[in-house]
Amino acid sequence: MTLRPVFIFDLDGTLVDSVYEHVLAWQEALDAEGIELSVWRIHRKIGMSGGLFTNQLLRETKVDITEDRVERLRHLHAKAYQRLSGKIRPLPGARELLQSLTNASIPWAIATSGRMETAAHNLAVLGVDV
């Protein structure tokens, strides 16, 4: 049996320079809900799944995070992120790396803890079909 290499890449902060747009979008969403949390605390949570993010948010702010509020926050984040996403670019060499792997018939995939409503733009910036 021959082992073949396979690559799985994270999207935000690995292939595209989008971390700060996520941070600013979450800050805007939290501000709209009256939840105070400093930017550096939000930055520490980027990459967490939605459930873990909201659990950490509850722990740090002592604010009740209901299902309705989670949905509002997600919607507000996505809306702010879409507005900020025009500045997002692939990180240097990311497109070329994916193309080189494709040309060499080496399978690769992209993973993200984000939702498609924000990830779709980043994938398009990379030239990846969804």
Where are these regions (language model features)?
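An amphipathic alpha-helix signature
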Residues: 23, 27, 50-55, 116, ...
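Short, acidic loop-to-helix structural element flanking the phosphoryl-transfer center
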Residues: 3, 83-110, 116-120
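A metal-dependent, Asp-based hydrolase signature
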Residues: 47-80, 92-95, 100-102
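A short, structured active-site edge motif that brings together acidic residues
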Residues: 41-46, 69-71, 128-130
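Conserved H-loop
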Residues: 36, 64, 128-130
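Generic non-transmembrane alpha-helical segments
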Residues: 25-33, 73-83
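Histidine/lysine/aspartate-rich catalytic loop segments that bind and position anionic ligands
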Residues: 113, 124-129
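Active-site neighborhood of HAD-like aspartate-dependent phosphohydrolases
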Residues: 2-43
